[in-house]
Amino acid sequence: MLNPWRAWASDTDSTIGKGAIVNAKQLGPKLDFASIQGYETREDAIIYEIHVRDFTSDHDISETLQAEFGTFASFIEKLDYIKNLGVTHIQLLPVMSYYFIDELNRDRILNYTSANNNYNWGYDPHSYFSLSGMYSQDPRNPELRIIEFKNLIQEIHNRGMGVTMDVVYNHTAQMHILEDIEPNYYHFMNLDASPRESFGGGRLGTTHAMSRRLLIDSICYFTEVFKIDGFRFDMMGDHDATTIQNAFDAKKSHQPECFNDW
């Protein structure tokens, strides 16, 4: 059983979850929110959605990379390409820890495959506070992924672009992730008193006090520690309106000019 508020989690052997006690605020560079020239309202946003691993996975650019392909570190090496497109915000597909992946398998997928591979968009969340080790140069190091992600955010901000995160709070990858902590509480419930499923996992019951707090605390954590400029909610309609408004208000209390792509 893993603490859902933990800041680092890993399942590198696909069998046993792991946790570490870290102080993310003390790791990596000191960050601030982006200052974006010409960006006044959300209608001014030019958003580039991108998968961290895909961005540098092309074999043709492998010899130009100093860092391992598909990582936060190699992403930095190609940031100028995005900047030259006139982008205001880089929207990262889910970077929080996700479930169905072997973080130690770094093989490049060169041929088309739709199943039985080690490729994942990240829409199967394992934790709402920890980062995926798939994008770290050493997934065994619980602190490195935090430092590398902060470095990426700093470099994006240094180029006058904002960072928005694609977040998946509507469900978890597996029912037991939250059911093991408190049965029949963290999820919305069916009429037969069983927890409601969604995409094979549990559908987060945001009308329940601690489920709502889990979501809002996660927003605040990534806002305070990583200075994320905005969030894109996956399947936002699965949440109740009060929770979404509270999440927006919490974000805005830290960053009045926040951008929320929901």
Describe each model-derived feature in a short phrase.
Residues 1-47, 56-63, 67:
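The feature marks proteins involved in alpha-glucan
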Residues 230-231:
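Active-site capping/gating regions of soluble enzymes
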